[in-house]
Amino acid sequence: MFQDSDFEEACRELQNPNINEAGYEFFTESSHDGCVARIYRQYNETSGLYKYKVYGTLADVDPEICSEVYMDLEYRRQWDTYVHELYEKEEDGKKLVYWNVNFPFPMSNRDYIYLRELREMESFEGNKIWAVMAKSVPCTSVPEKKGVIRVDDYLQSCVLSTDGKVGSKGEISKFYCNALQLHST
């Protein structure tokens, strides 16, 4: 599903974020206790929705542990109050993720069916990187649910690396969500 070039492109943004050239505008920034997040967005004229990129730093977070938490669906169900339903499903030899997300009234919940892959890679400087790619896939064995909007154009990349400092500090040098577009079809 994912090519080496997909992962390489995501990892390149560690050194050279593709924001202005791609038409992203600064949206907001937040910082707390050594954690910083900068959010950029790109407007889609056709859909009227935005794509988002988030770049941030987490103090005292090991990127390998962060990647394990990111991939652990059972643990996510424990802490994420937006999870209505979340599980893996095998289809055609591939592990798919089904995720039904609670949205506040009066909005409808959204659900996603996507394939994801985690790769441990090496940066161009030789540092270890954990990269996750996720993308919507069709799945006829999980029918759409009444009152829930199926998101069929989900694309996400998450790239985690260390900041190289002594100790357990880590950096999410690039955590960007492409096409978190909540389309109804």
Question: Over which residues does each language-model region extend?
Answer:
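Eukaryotic helix-grip
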Residues: 1-185
